[in-house]
Amino acid sequence: MSSFGDFIALSDICDTDTARLIKREVSDGVIAPGYTDEALELLKQKKKGAYNIIQIDPSYQPAPIERKQVYGITFEQGRNELDINGDLLSNIVTVNKEIPESALIDMKIALITLKYTQSNSVCYVKDGQAIGIGAGQQSRIHCTRLAGSKADNWFLRQSPQVLGLQFVDSLGRANRDNAIDVYMGDEYMDVLADGTWEGIFKVKPPVFTREEKRAWLDQMQDVTLGSDAFFPFSDNI
């Protein structure tokens, strides 16, 4: 979620538990095929009643031809209706033919994510969720780097150094998230400098060193890498 808001899209009916999670997030709106009565009442309270709640028809079928106009010129192409299923992954070209079921699930999630992400696009998936997406870049290796840095940050947020941060009670969730992002990056002194950290942390944390980050990242395994087209050069890998 963006610190300044985002739209949330759900593929199933929004229930009460999901609505409670959404209610505390900075968000501009939600779209779903339906809402339970209690969930709808919770979401109506968000943004003093100005929160966008959209219901989509789950039976809607888009037109087979997509059209876009650019300065009076109409471009059209067939809609991407590729059915992503296990058959797409049946041709295993590596020496090792044994792929765990969990990896096959992550591969399908990667393909679904990339199907609806602006090209060029690359994503990393782990344990059933996309942990890093790089999209809309002219160079595929730039997509890989962008997605990889997001995946690294996702895992670094689970490190003992980050989980042990003690924030001042008055700091909001969005500001905490931003402080964590800066703390993990190269500009960490922006939150650790004297006169600054006191407004963020109860106790000044030590620098999260490059060596410590590398050691933690080396523990990450079972990550799936996906691309919306072939990798033209081995440097992406």
Indicate where each model-derived feature is located.
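ATP-dependent carboxylate/acyl-activation modules
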Residues: M1-I237
